[in-house]
Amino acid sequence: MADLGSGTPQLRKLGIVPGARWSVIGADPGWRFETTPDAAAEVSGSAPADVVLVFVRAAAELEPALVEQEQRVFPAGALWIAWPRKAAGHVSDLGDSVVRDAALARRLVDVKVAALDHDWSALKLVWRREHR
């Protein structure tokens, strides 16, 4: 998938570096990283991870996704929540403010927003320092 905007490689943008444990949840069939994560380990289920990327398509999916995935990145990992980009013509009741508000209510804070590709934007969430 082509990177938009910054020119930063997609994996680096997401924090998936050699040695990282990562997981992708809910991606569309055929969605993939623009390059293969070298020397990083994909983990599944509820296994702890350094980076979890969750694709959500509607606001109703957001809270369950946060509840299911937030502990996987505790205390120092990153939970990326991706939603369909309205700029690409997608219709969705999600956006950065909806994701941010839901995250703050769960003791998570947003630290970065990124365009993953033409179809998806994402917000990077981490645990607030006082809750680590």
What label would you give each PLM region?
Residues A39-A49:
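Short acidic low-complexity segments
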Residues M1-I16:
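Flexible, polar/low-complexity N-terminal or interdomain linker segments that lie immediately upstream
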Residues K13-A27:
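Conserved class I S-adenosyl-L-methionine
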Residues D28-T35, G89-V91:
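Short, charged/polar "capping" segments at the starts of alpha-helices
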Residues L53-L62:
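Short, glycine-rich nucleotide/cofactor-binding loops
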